[in-house]
């Protein structure tokens, strides 16, 4: 699913870009006001203190987790 987004979000650099400036799946609209991001740190205070290293770690986690807990990843609260 991440590879079908525009722009593709199936690599760490693309996910870091998304964490800084999130857009809709088609890439046309900014969703920063409704999604935590560096761009919306005034709305989401926890984003204020994140460094680029933190963002790369988060993106790496997102890329790795489906391989670790494949059926649970992205399944929401039903698995917990």
Curated annotation (Swiss-Prot):
Q: Name one Pfam family in it.
A: Cytochrom_C550
Q: Which cofactor does it need?
A: heme
Annotated transmembrane regions: none
Q: Where in the cell is it found?
A: Plastid, Chloroplast thylakoid membrane
Described function:
One of the extrinsic, lumenal subunits of photosystem II (PSII). PSII is a light-driven water plastoquinone oxidoreductase, using light energy to abstract electrons from H(2)O, generating a proton gradient subsequently used for ATP formation. The extrinsic proteins stabilize the structure of photosystem II oxygen-evolving complex (OEC), the ion environment of oxygen evolution and protect the OEC against heat-induced inactivation.
Q: Which organism is it from?
A: Thalassiosira weissflogii (Marine diatom)
Q: Which family does it belong to?
A: Belongs to the cytochrome c family. PsbV subfamily.
Read off the SUPFAM superfamilies from this record: Cytochrome c
| Binding positions (heme) | 47
Q: What InterPro entries does the database record attribute to this sequence?
A: Cyt_c-like_dom_sf, Cytochrom_C550
Q: Signal peptide: which range, if any?
A: none
What is the protein's name according to its record?
Photosystem II extrinsic protein V
Membrane topology type: Peripheral membrane protein
Cofactor annotation comment: Binds 1 heme group covalently per subunit.
Q: This protein's superkingdom?
A: Eukaryota
One cellular component term (GO) for this entry is:
photosystem II
Does the keyword Metal-binding feature in the UniProt annotation? yes
**Primary location class:** plastid
């Amino acid at each position: 699913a991440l590879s079908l987004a525009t722009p593709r979000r199936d690599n760490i650099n693309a996910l870091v870009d998304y964490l800084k400036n999130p857009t809709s799946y088609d890439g046309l609209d900014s969703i920063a006001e409704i999604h935590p991001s560096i761009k919306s740190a005034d709305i989401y205070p926890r984003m204020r203190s994140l460094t680029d290293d933190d963002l790369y770690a988060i993106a790496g986690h997102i890329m790795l987790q489906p391989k670790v807990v494949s059926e649970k990843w992205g399944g929401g609260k039903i698995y917990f």
